[in-house]
Amino acid sequence: MAHKKAGGSTRNGRDSESKRLGVKRFGGEAVLAGSIIVRQRGTKFHAGIDVGCGKDHTLFALKDGKVKFEVKGPKNRKFISIEAE
């Protein structure tokens, strides 16, 4: 009788769901007001001109225009702005 007893269950095999973070609209892309530009944890990117920041640090367009990425200030912070078309 070729039987095999059941093996013990493992305690591994779990992972958290991905949060789909990152840049959603890149430099030079046209956006409409309300469009999400970046989803992030913390302020890796800062809100520039015509860009709003949500409570989870999501950056979104306040006006229609083109996305512009720039590095400014003494701390070389990355800012995202909207340029009017």
UniProtKB/Swiss-Prot annotation:
Xref: PROSITE patterns: RIBOSOMAL_L27
Keyword tags: Ribonucleoprotein, Ribosomal protein
Gene Ontology cellular-component terms listed: cytosolic large ribosomal subunit
MF-aspect GO terms: structural constituent of ribosome
Disordered as annotated region, ranges: 1-20
Biological process annotations from GO: translation
NCBIfam families tied to this protein: L27
Similarity annotation: Belongs to the bacterial ribosomal protein bL27 family.
Name recorded for this polypeptide: Large ribosomal subunit protein bL27
The organism of origin for this protein: Yersinia enterocolitica serotype O:8 / biotype 1B (strain NCTC 13174 / 8081)
